[in-house]
């Protein structure tokens, strides 16, 4: 009847909304099934101790040094190893964060330099890049193109200086 008693205790310790006991703690559950009254008291103490430790971890480890020391004696290598791994991951994430921040700032500076160079330059290559790259909406680009087509019906050479001027005006207005 010891087998059914331990199964009953396993079900008795399971609380609604909580996952079942991990395999590492199920061994404690089966070893405490010796006496009915003594086993339950021992399990209650273990459960209370586990709850206190879990509460301390949730609060950030403040207070309750006695229960914390008892919990650390049971599994120090695993907890210490987990904390060391967590620290390493946090340091790595901080380094990655700083690296990405530096790259973002460098990209921002490059964009500002490019915008300044394109505003200063009067070549058609820069105008082409501005027309194709810096319009917020396709509608703005199409409206500007249809206005230019409606105003002048000459050769493409006649329209290119006007396109450059309208693009420069658009850039100056947007800044």
Curated annotation (Swiss-Prot):
Chain segments carrying region Disordered: 141-175
Composition skew (Polar residues), residue ranges: 157-169
Organism domain of life: Eukaryota
PANTHER family per UniProt: LEUCINE REPEAT ADAPTER PROTEIN 25, PROTEIN FAM89A
Family (UniProt): Belongs to the FAM89 family.
Protein name as it appears in the record: Protein FAM89A
Organism: Mus musculus (Mouse)
Lineage: Eukaryota, Metazoa, Chordata, Craniata, Vertebrata
């Amino acid at each position: 009847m010891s087998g059914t008693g331990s199964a009953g205790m396993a079900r008795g310790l399971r609380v609604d909304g909580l996952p079942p006991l991990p395999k590492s703690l199920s061994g404690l559950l089966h070893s405490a099934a010796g006496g009915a009254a003594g086993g339950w008291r021992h399990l209650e103490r273990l459960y209370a101790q586990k709850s206190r430790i879990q509460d301390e971890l949730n609060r950030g480890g403040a207070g309750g040094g006695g229960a914390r020391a008892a919990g650390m004696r049971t599994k120090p290598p695993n907890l210490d190893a987990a904390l060391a791994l967590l620290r390493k991951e946090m340091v790595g994430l901080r380094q990655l964060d700083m690296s990405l921040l530096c790259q973002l700032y460098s990209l921002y500076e490059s964009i500002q330099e490019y915008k300044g160079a394109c505003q200063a330059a009067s070549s058609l290559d820069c105008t082409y890049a501005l027309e194709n790259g810096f319009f917020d909406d396709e509608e703005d680009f199409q409206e500007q193109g249809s206005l230019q087509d409606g105003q002048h019906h000459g050769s493409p050479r006649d329209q290119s200086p006007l396109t450059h001027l309208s693009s420069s005006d658009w850039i100056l207005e947007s800044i």
